[in-house]
Amino acid sequence: MNYEKQDNLLNAFKELLAQERFGSQSEIVQALQELGFTQINQSKVSRMLTKFGAVRTRNTRMEMVYCLPNELSVPNTKSPLKNLVLDIDHNHFVVVIRTTPGAAQLIARLLDSIGKADGILGTIAGDDTIFVTPTLDANIADLIKSIRNLFETSI
């Protein structure tokens, strides 16, 4: 699929979810097919729902429907970092960073690029959680301070 078609599909997908009238993935598939996206199937819709952090919620008619909450939108290159980091916590051995859904790998990659010079041995990232392991000589309080400064947050 070329980029223009993919962008058109993603835009149509987002517009459909904004209507808050689709209660099942098969309804979304059917609507996209009616818009001319004939190669769409349930598994592709499922992946897009996951990618964009879609949730099922009740609409104004009290029907369970899929929607894309604004506060859970997928990060992009224009997202300010401080908006992606929700919480930073730690114990004596590891720092745990909670992010918006889909942002953990982006933030972890940034932390990995900073590297050992600032006390970061490595990171492990899921969808919305990052484990940061400090180097042996790193003071955990100093590491927390530098991470918070990086994300301009006082969490």
From Swiss-Prot:
Q: Which UniProt keywords apply?
A: Amino-acid biosynthesis, Arginine biosynthesis, Cytoplasm, DNA-binding, Repressor, Transcription, Transcription regulation
* Metabolic or biological pathway: Amino-acid biosynthesis; L-arginine biosynthesis [regulation]
Leader sequence residues: none
Principal localization reads: cytoplasm
- Entry superkingdom: Bacteria
User: A GO term (biological process) for this protein?
Assistant: protein complex oligomerization
Q: Which Gene3D superfamilies match?
A: 3.30.1360.40, Winged helix-like DNA-binding domain superfamily/Winged helix DNA-binding domain
Subcellular localization: Cytoplasm
**What GO MF terms are annotated?**
arginine binding; DNA binding; DNA-binding transcription factor activity
Query: Which InterPro entries does this entry report, sorted A to Z?
Result: Arg_repress, Arg_repress_C, Arg_repress_C_sf, Arg_repress_DNA-bd, WH-like_DNA-bd_sf, WH_DNA-bd_sf
Query: GO CC annotations?
Result: cytoplasm
Q: Which family does it belong to?
A: Belongs to the ArgR family.
Could you tell me what this protein does?
Answer: Regulates arginine biosynthesis genes.
> Which named protein is this?
Arginine repressor
State the species of origin: Pasteurella multocida (strain Pm70)
